[in-house]
Regions:
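Conserved Class I SAM-dependent methyltransferase catalytic core
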Residues: 210-266
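Conserved AdoMet
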Residues: 30-105
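Conserved hydrophobic residues forming the short capping helix/wall of the S-adenosyl-L-methionine
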Residues: 16, 155, 243
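Residue-level signal for inorganic ion chemistry
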Residues: 31, 69, 99, 125, ...
Length: 268
């Protein structure tokens, strides 16, 4: 006997909860909608409908991956970020809501400015900024050629004119720089992370040395004279001190949606 969509969701939610997933019901809904090829809203309307055999098999396969703590974004192959949807896979860090604060800073630069997204990964910050401020010239830089493949594919699919270059922070960036946005590795080595992160996301995009500041220190030293720099960080006070010592005068710390101090903004 085939189970209803509602029953399938209930069982899946229980399974994911037992596996330790933080949002089991939401995850189950997203995966079932994917298996059925419908929007999540349709699951409510069709809750009493039986789940077909083919959809059931697809759903079970997706659930098995999530129960192994693979992130939903990697399972689906996409992640929403501000007003765009990005393709993502284990070559790049999954864009997170707190990183949207970097885009908000980028939106404040003068018309026609040139902004560099350092450590661009999937291209999330660069592409979201260009989408909302087409007047800007935006360049994405990353040390990973694999990540740049993902970023360029996202730009092409979204039809956004953003260049991406292989490089180490600001080394090799020529021409004027009116703003720098950076989500660099800032997790200290040895810090325990959730399985979704530790097992699946690229370590090079996460860990920033013994105190998590190795890469950030290098960028701060390179960015002297840049009108504005914004960085997502784990130690906002330490980063603020680095920026102050580098000669930046106006420094503020922005909170994310969870009310954590997450982004440091400095103006020269």
């Amino acid at each position: 006997m085939r189970v209803s969509i509602a029953d399938a969701l209930g069982r899946a939610s229980a399974r994911l909860s037992e596996a330790g997933c933080d949002t089991p019901r939401l995850d189950a809904e997203l995966l079932l909608a994917e298996a059925l090829g419908v929007d999540r809203e349709r699951l409510v309307l069709d809750a009493a409908e039986p789940l077909g055999e083919g959809a059931s098999e697809r759903f079970d396969a997706l659930l098995a991956r999530r129960a192994a703590r693979e992130p939903v974004a990697y399972i689906l192959g996409r992640k929403e970020f501000r007003r765009i949807t990005l393709a993502v896979d284990p070559r790049v860090l999954i864009p997170r809501p707190e990183t949207e604060r970097l885009v908000e800073v980028g939106l404040t630069v003068p018309p026609g400015a040139r902004v560099i997204d350092v450590g661009t990964g999937s291209g999330a910050v660069a592409l979201a900024l260009k989408h909302e401020r087409p007047d800007l010239t935006v360049l994405g830089v990353d040390l990973s050629a694999d990540a740049l493949e993902v970023a360029r594919a996202n730009a092409a699919r979204l039809g956004l004119d953003v260049d991406f270059v292989l490089g180490d922070l600001l080394n090799g960036v020529e021409g004027p720089v009116d703003g720098v946005l950076a989500n660099l590795p800032y997790v200290a080595e040895g810090v325990g992370l959730a399985p979704e992160i530790s097992r699946y996301e690229p370590p090079a995009a996460l860990f920033g040395g013994p105190d998590g500041l190795d890469v950030i220190r290098r960028l701060v030293a390179m960015a002297k004279g840049v009108p504005v720099i914004a960085m997502e960080v784990g130690l906002p006070q330490a980063v603020s001190t680095l920026l102050e010592r580098a000669g930046f005068e106006s420094i503020e710390v922005l909170r994310d949606l969870a009310d954590h101090e997450r982004v440091v903004v400095a103006r020269g």
